[in-house]
Each structure stands twice: as structure tokens, then as C-alpha cells.
Curated annotation (Swiss-Prot):
UniProt binding sites for ATP: K184, H203, G219, L220, S221, G222, T223, G224, K225, T226, T227, E268, R304, T430
UniProt remark on cofactor binding: Binds 1 Mn(2+) ion per subunit.
Listed EC numbers: 4.1.1.49
One BP annotation, GO: gluconeogenesis
InterPro entries: PEP_carboxykinase_ATP, PEP_carboxykinase_C, PEP_carboxykinase_N, PEPCK_ATP_CS
Positions contributing to substrate binding: R44, Y178, K184, R304
Cofactor (UniProt): Mn(2+)
Gene (name only): pckA
Protein name per UniProt: Phosphoenolpyruvate carboxykinase (ATP)
GO molecular function: ATP binding; metal ion binding; phosphoenolpyruvate carboxykinase (ATP) activity
Any one GO cellular component localisation term in the record: cytosol
Length: 513
């Protein structure tokens, strides 16, 4: 470290905000949040993410377009270059943890070049009362957004990269201003490590009621994980990343990373109230009075708020609870043919978990050509799961079977027609569906079967118009509905051909005509 460079260790959020303002890294909003702009990368860069290929990962990773291999020697050389760059400038260090279960946490030393990225890290990771009390081997995360990679020299895809090295327990982020890369990289680390310990890592939100009734909400970004788990009547565990171990569900993080597009106090009061001093607002436009305009998408559809769980009044302080009674798969159906809620058998749960059918809504990935497009994302989070999909599906079924959890498919997308002509289910309707699920009011109820979709739908849900429950009722053109439903069933069938699973699971999905 040069004589003029300063290393700031374990600063408070207030101290970091002072540094961020002094360094010109962003602006303080009227509500007290710190607003930062991430430049041309306003989402994750999947083509720039790599995992170092070495003996411990060579035969365990599902290598391909998602998990791209990186040379170990190239990693060492680039890490050394970036580390030297960091040491020559002021930087920030904190001692944090990932995983709220004392049996399954990882200690992480986070080093960042900027103060605002450090606030993000302290918000999103766990700030323990006593760091690494079990003396677990620690990880290092180094985030240096102003470092410019040289692809020919460094072996990267572009001027920025995210590299995960399991053998050395290191994560390198260079040239990446989008802060979400930090949290997702450590999520990927836990997603690789936890299954070996018999723990299912999940891309889901979680909350728990007064009676200890835990509920999980799986889904891609924009499908409702954060909104639906932020329920004023229940205690929040977390909004995005969890582990399901025998006897417990625990948060992998210590904060929330909420989408801000069209955020309103009326529809999302918990999130609204959490955005205050200490919160990071990412790519949010301010008006002339520095009031956030959450309807302004001129920078991106993927504007975000990162805040610590302490900003949520009604939360589970321990960041963990018991095993779930209800498991909800959130799908945003752009074809408009899926019902608002379906009750899944164990086999159907496996089918839909592996399929991960949904839409990219205001995609979190850069380079998305459309703000809404359908997709199949294995385990409702394919970009973050390094092992083969079957590993996670088998663990899910094991947990569901052993604990007797009920599984539901909830459509937060369109009905009455596809995106563009149909109408999206409003938040109050989806909340009523979720309320019925978490309160146990859909257990053992009368259902009707939708043949082409192979789904069982309740004939009545408290607080929901019964005409909405069977989607054919919401379409004026019934023949057009049948056409779209058959097309979706065929898409499911085609997508599922890549999975080598039992006939019971294969036959639990939609039936291509």
C-alpha cells in the first residue's frame, strides 16, 4: 500500500455515507437514501461471469453458457494486478458473513474501492455481533469498479468480469459498478457448497406468521418475491436467498434488494418505509427536490433499493425460522393462460421447479432486447446454480416429502390474453391468493382440473373473483385461449426433454396435444 493510501476498516454506514458524498460517488436523496448510478451496466453481466476450473470443481460444476470455466493461472495473475491497484488507492474493508445459520455461515472479508459499494455490501451481507465465532475458513471478495480488464491479456470477455475461485475462496469483481453482482456471486458460492451439507439453497423469499408457519416464494426477478414476502401481517425472514436445512429455513443475506420500478407506498408499504438513511438507491432518478421518481425508467427498468433487514420493522430478528408449511412457485405468465393459483402434487412440484417457467420482467441482465419475455429458468434461478439441476430438485423433493410442505404455482402475470392484450393480475388479487395459501385455507379444498395444463385449480379462493380462477373464463375468444394453452403446453414439453427424471415427474407437467 502506498504511503498516501488509506485503508478504512469496519466503518459504520454513517461514516461510509460521509465518505461517499465527500468522494462524489452519488447524491443524498430527500428521504435520506444514497443514490448511485452504475453507468452502462444496469444489470448483471452473465457473459462476464466465470468460475475457476480446478480439481475441486472440474467434475462438480454444470459447465456451459451459465457457468463458464476460467483458467487458474489467469485468475492468479489478474487477482495480483487488481490487488496491487487497490493497495495503491484508498479502500474499504469489512468483516461480514453469508448465511444466518450458525452451522452453515461463511465469513467474508469484503474489500471495495468505493464507499457506496461498501454500504451495499454491509446492507446485503450479515454484520455479525462476533465475527467468525466458529473459526470457519474465510472468503475474500474484492470489488474494484474502476479497474479496466484487458481481455487478450486477462482472459476475460470484456473490460469487466466476475470471477469465483472455490479452491482459494476468492471472488473478484473488476470493472463492475452494478452492485447486484456482489450479492449474487456469494449466493452462487453458497449454492455450490450447501448441497454437499444436505442443505437446499433457494432463490426465494421467506416469511413466517405468528404461529411459526413459514412460507417460501420462489421466482425470478420481478415476479413478486420481494413484494409478496413484505407482508405487514407476517415477519420477514428475507427477500431473495435462503437455505432449507433439516429443521430450519435461514436467510443467506442480511438485507433486501428490492426493485423500485413503479414503487408506491400504497401497494408496497414495507419496502417504501425501508428506504431511508443507510439505504442505497441504484439507478433511481431524482426530481428537482431530490425526491425519488420511481416511475421514471429513463436509466433502467431495473432500478433498485438495497437496505438492511433492520429497516423492516416486522422481521425475524434471527434471520431464520422453522421449515415451511407452504412453498409457492411464482410464475409471470406472458401468454395469459395459467391460472392465478394451482395446487401441485409432489411430482408436479418437481416438474415445475425444474422447468422454472416465468418471464424476465424488466430484466436484471444487461443486453435484454425486451422488457418482458418468457423464459424457462431451472430452479427459478438458473444463473446462480453451479451444480447440475437434478441435485437441487432431488433436495427439494426430499425436503417437501420429509416435512409435508404444500406446494403451489401462483401466476403473477397475465390473464384474459397475452402480454399486450390481456390484463396483469393486480397486487391485491395476488396478495389475496397468497393470504389464502399461508393461512392454510387451500389445504384439502375442492378443485377443478385443467387438462391441457395438467393443473388442479381451487374452485374458490377467499377474496378472489371466482371467474379468475379458471383462465378460460377471462378470455373473450375461447378458441384463442385453447390455441395459446396448447402452445404453452408444447413449450413445457420441449423444454423438459433435457431432464433425465422419472416418468412420474415427466407426466406431471402440461400435456402437449
Amino acid at each position: 500500500m502506498t504511503s498516501s493510501a488509506t485503508r478504512f476498516v469496519d466503518l459504520t454506514a454513517a461514516e461510509l455515507v460521509e465518505h461517499a458524498i465527500r468522494r462524489g460517488e452519488g447524491t443524498l436523496a430527500a428521504n435520506g437514501a444514497f443514490v448511485a448510478n452504475t453507468g452502462h451496466r444496469t444489470g448483471r453481466s452473465p457473459k462476464d461471469r466465470f468460475i475457476v476450473q480446478e480439481s475441486s470443481t472440474e467434475n462438480e460444476i454444470q459447465w456451459g453458457n451459465v457457468n463458464r470455466p476460467f483458467d487458474a493461472d489467469k485468475f492468479d495473475a489478474l487477482w495480483a494486478r487488481v490487488e496491487a491497484y487497490v493497495q495503491s488507492n484508498d479502500h474499504f474493508i469489512s468483516h461480514l458473513e453469508v448465511g444466518a445459520d450458525p452451522e452453515h455461515y461463511l465469513p467474508v472479508v469484503v474489500t471495495t474501492e468505493t464507499a457506496w459499494h461498501h454500504i451495499f455490501a454491509k446492507n446485503m451481507f450479515i454484520q455479525p455481533k462476533s465475527y467468525n465465532s466458529s473459526d470457519v475458513p474465510q472468503w475474500q471478495v474484492m470489488n474494484v469498479p474502476s479497474f479496466v480488464c484487458e481481455p487478450e491479456r486477462d482472459g476475460t470477455n470484456s473490460d469487466g468480469t466476475v470471477l469465483i475461485n472455490f479452491a482459494q475462496r476468492k471472488v473478484l469483481l473488476a470493472g463492475m459498478r452494478y452492485a447486484g453482482e456482489m450479492k449474487k456471486s456469494m449466493f452462487s458460492v453458497q449454492n455450490f457448497l450447501l448441497p454437499a451439507k444436505g442443505v437446499l439453497p433457494m432463490h426465494c423469499s421467506a416469511n413466517v406468521g405468528e404461529a411459526g408457519d413459514t412460507a417460501l416464494f420462489f421466482g425470478l426477478s420481478g415476479t413478486g418475491k420481494t413484494t409478496l414476502s413484505a407482508d405487514p401481517t407476517r415477519f420477514l425472514i428475507g427477500d431473495d436467498e435462503h437455505g432449507w436445512a433439516p429443521g430450519s429455513v435461514f436467510n443467506i443475506e442480511g438485507g433486501c434488494y428490492a426493485k423500485c420500478i413503479d414503487l408506491s407506498q400504497k401497494n408496497e408499504p414495507v419496502i417504501w418505509d425501508a428506504i431511508r438513511f443507510g439505504t442505497i438507491l441504484e439507478n433511481v432518478v431524482l426530481d428537482e427536490n431530490r425526491v425519488p421518481d420511481f416511475n421514471d425508467t429513463s436509466l433502467t427498468q431495473n432500478s433498485r433499493a438495497a437496505y438492511p433487514l433492520e429497516h423492516v420493522e416486522k422481521r425475524k430478528v434471527e434471520n431464520r425460522a422453522g421449515e415451511p408449511k407452504a412453498v409457492v412457485f411464482l410464475t409471470c405468465d406472458v401468454s395469459g393462460v395459467l391460472p392465478p393459483v394451482s395446487i401441485l402434487t409432489e411430482e408436479a412440484a418437481a416438474f415445475h421447479f425444474l422447468s422454472g417457467y416465468t418471464a424476465k420482467v424488466g430484466s436484471t441482465e444487461i443486453g435484454s432486447t425486451s422488457d418482458i419475455e418468457s423464459t424457462f429458468s431451472t430452479c427459478f434461478g438458473a444463473p446462480f446454480f453451479p451444480r447440475p439441476a437434478g441435485v437441487y430438485a432431488e433436495l427439494l423433493m426430499k425436503r417437501v416429502r420429509e416435512f409435508g410442505a404444500k406446494v403451489y404455482l401462483v401466476n403473477t402475470g397475465w390473464t384474459g390474453g397475452p402480454y399486450g392484450t390481456g390484463k396483469r393480475f393486480d397486487i391485491p388479487t395476488t396478495r389475496a391468493v397468497v393470504d389464502a395459501i399461508v393461512s392454510g385455507k387451500l389445504v384439502g379444498v375442492e378443485t377443478q382440473h385443467i387438462d391441457v395444463l395438467n393443473l388442479d385449480v381451487p374452485v374458490a379462493v377467499p377474496g378472489v373473483d371466482s371467474n379468475l380462477l379458471n383462465p378460460i373464463n377471462t378470455w373473450e375468444d375461447k378458441a384463442k385461449y385453447a390455441e395459446y394453452a396448447a402452445k404453452l403446453a408444447a413449450d413445457f414439453t420441449e423444454n423438459f426433454t433435457k431432464y433425465d427424471v422419472s416418468d412420474e415427474i415427466k407426466n406431471a407437467g402440461p400435456k402437449a396435444q
